[in-house]
Amino acid sequence: MRRKKKKPLKTALFLFLLLTICGAVVFFYRTKQQYQQVMALESEVVKQAEKNGISEYRELILSMILTESKGLGNDPMQSSESAYGEAGRTSDPSESIAQGVSYLAESIALAQDQGVDLWTAV
């Protein structure tokens, strides 16, 4: 009679662990896919960061892209608002990155002039 009580508990624990492992695999797979999508834009980010004199902020820019769009769509930096005053006007990822990096460079320069930290600029 004791065995019957332990078996459902073991089954429930096994199912819980199995679902947890499956969830972790899906989470890590999606995260890897997002990372790869963002890193596909790295060469354009490096080019624009060097052009705007903020090449030391490459990782920050890539992090912003990951946060804003996961590297998807035509406006990975969500920067059409700063260029055109409205969302969805950017049709090319390179244009979005150029505008976003330029705006970030201006914000960093302004933050340094005002004596505030980097995160205020971001």
Walk through the language-model features, giving the residues of each:
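N-terminal Sec-pathway targeting helices
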Residues: 2-28
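Catalytic glycan-binding domains that act on GlcNAc-containing polysaccharides
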Residues: 32-122
